[in-house]
């Protein structure tokens, strides 16, 4: 990578990101702008993928809201996310959990790792 680009992106990287992987349940505190006001909206769900590296790294969180699956993709180092909390650590054997989209109810559960 170009040293100039690398030095610019290093200043943008966040250091307060917890360690989480696909299968973990996270609570994302996202900043939402409505008109002139800004508020925090909490989005809690299972991380189904994590891709990219460095400043362009992204993760996708899936939750079931009123019986409908909702997925949101966030950049890891965005200032639009106030904080990320890991609620539960899950044990999975895949890096991408897209198969959870087809499952519902108890079949979509993920085994928990006790820490």
From Swiss-Prot:
Stored Pfam families? Ribosomal_L19 (PF01245)
Extract the InterPro entries matched here: Ribosomal_bL19, Ribosomal_bL19_CS, Ribosomal_bL19_sf, Translation_prot_SH3-like_sf
Statement: the UniProt record of this protein carries the keyword Ribosomal protein? yes
Identify a single GO molecular function assigned to this protein: structural constituent of ribosome
UniProt keywords (A-Z) are: Ribonucleoprotein, Ribosomal protein
- Please give the biological process terms from Gene Ontology that the record holds: translation
Q: Which GO terms describe its cellular component?
A: cytosolic large ribosomal subunit
Q: Which PANTHER family match?
A: LARGE RIBOSOMAL SUBUNIT PROTEIN BL19M, RIBOSOMAL PROTEIN L19
Q: Which family does it belong to?
A: Belongs to the bacterial ribosomal protein bL19 family.
Q: What task does this protein carry out?
A: This protein is located at the 30S-50S ribosomal subunit interface and may play a role in the structure and function of the aminoacyl-tRNA binding site.
Q: What is this protein called?
A: Large ribosomal subunit protein bL19
């Amino acid at each position: 990578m170009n040293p100039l680009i690398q030095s610019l992106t290093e200043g943008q990287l966040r250091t307060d990101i917890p360690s989480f992987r696909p299968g973990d349940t996270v609570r994302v505190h996202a900043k939402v702008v409505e008109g002139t006001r800004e508020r925090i909206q909490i989005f809690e769900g299972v991380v189904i993928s994590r891709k990219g590296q460095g400043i362009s790294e992204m993760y996708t969180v899936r939750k079931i809201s009123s019986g409908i699956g909702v997925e949101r993709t966030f950049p890891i180092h965005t200032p639009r996310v106030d904080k990320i909390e890991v609620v539960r650590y899950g044990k999975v054997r895949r890096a991408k959990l897209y198969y959870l989209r087809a499952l519902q109810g108890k079949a979509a559960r993920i085994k928990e790792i006790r820490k």
